[in-house]
């Protein structure tokens, strides 16, 4: 029952998260409330996404569970270091974008400008370094239970689906420039060409 509850929770979160991120929904809101109110949308979206994800973590931690595996030391220490490195990569990936725009603060004080395609730093290695870092952080967990494994699998599937739809959005937004970038740079794993 725990697995089903976690999967349904993440599915519901993913559907809401994806709907709120869609261009069609944002366009609908802009028509309904006007462009000026949309200046705070990115910040609202980020705060809502974070806060609405917390209730998913609660059942993972509190519902009946069983240990799947626990990696012994010293390998577990290396995995924890890997998680730390993944967290650093996540922060670097955000910093290599327009961080204030990414979190939604710049839009509060300035008129939103067309986004620029970031292809430097970590984005020279993979097209989605934030997803790569997130996947590394999840799967380098040295202790995994049935509940956490369920969350990791579902989150991984959601990340791949999200990357697919984000790619389509980026192709619409940047056209040939993104198509050329996509042809040169792997999606998630550096130096792996078939992505």
Predicted feature descriptions by range:
Residues 2-16, 112-195:
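Hydrophobic transmembrane alpha-helices
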Residues 9-23, 55, 83-105, 152-171:
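Transmembrane alpha-helical segments that form the membrane-embedded catalytic/substrate-channel core
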Residues 18-36:
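Membrane-interface helix-loop junction between the first two transmembrane segments
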Residues 28-32, 61-73:
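Membrane-interface helix termini and inter-helical loops of multi-pass transporters
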Residues 31-48:
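Loop-to-helix transition at the N-terminal end of transmembrane alpha-helices
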Residues 46-60, 83-87, 124-137:
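Core segments of transmembrane alpha-helices
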Residues 56-67, 141-144:
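Juxtamembrane "helix exit" motif at the C-terminal ends of alpha-helical transmembrane segments
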Residues 70-85:
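Interfacial segments of alpha-helical transmembrane regions
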